[in-house]
Amino acid sequence: VNFTTPLEWKSEAWWRNRSTAERLFHLHIPRRINDNMDKWKALDTAPDENLFLQGPSGSGKSLIAAKTLTTLIEDHKVSGRWVEADDYIEMIKDSFDNEGVLPEMYSSPHVVKYVKGVFDIVVIDGLGEERLTEFASHELGSLIRKRYDKQKTTIITSRLSIQDIKNRYGSRLANPLADFEHEVLRGKR
């Protein structure tokens, strides 16, 4: 079955009520991760539990996040999306350049709005790997804070500790992370 992403705005209920196969299709997990996650085990978590996965490069953070996301989508009637932190910043810039709507190269002109508050679960992969600018810090902080305030589940992967994140971005971004379930992964897997 070949699914397409709708160009017109869709509600939370619309995204939740798609088939499991369609909800998995719309996750947009990168192929390099999707092709390797079968070997990994999902974290035992509920669809309303925020997660912060910290560890060095190669420790399996992204694979565990992907496996956890897909398992939650398969086991519950929830919607989700995968987004790299640096790609999210590019999406925001592109939406500013196009009057709030993303150009055709993106899966949906509304993906930024969906990530901010429509999708039930969002993985933000590689927090701290993007080029640090005031703009990036503000936008990532805004995303995490909005999702936190709306009680939307967020799974974050980072090489940085919460203290490093606080030092890099400030408490606006770091404070919500104190309520996240925190997993520290050690070394290469």
Language-model features: where?
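A short, basic N-terminal segment
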Residues: 1-43, 181-183
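Loop/turn-to-beta-strand initiation segments
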Residues: 79, 118-121, 150-156
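Short glycine-rich substrate-engagement loop in P-loop NTPases that contacts/grips substrate
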Residues: 73-118
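A generic structural signal for nonpolar/aromatic side chains embedded in well-ordered alpha-helices
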Residues: 40, 114-115, 176-177
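Walker A/P-loop nucleotide-binding motif
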Residues: 48-66
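A structural signal for short, well-ordered beta-strand segments and their strand-loop junctions
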Residues: 52-54, 80-84, 156
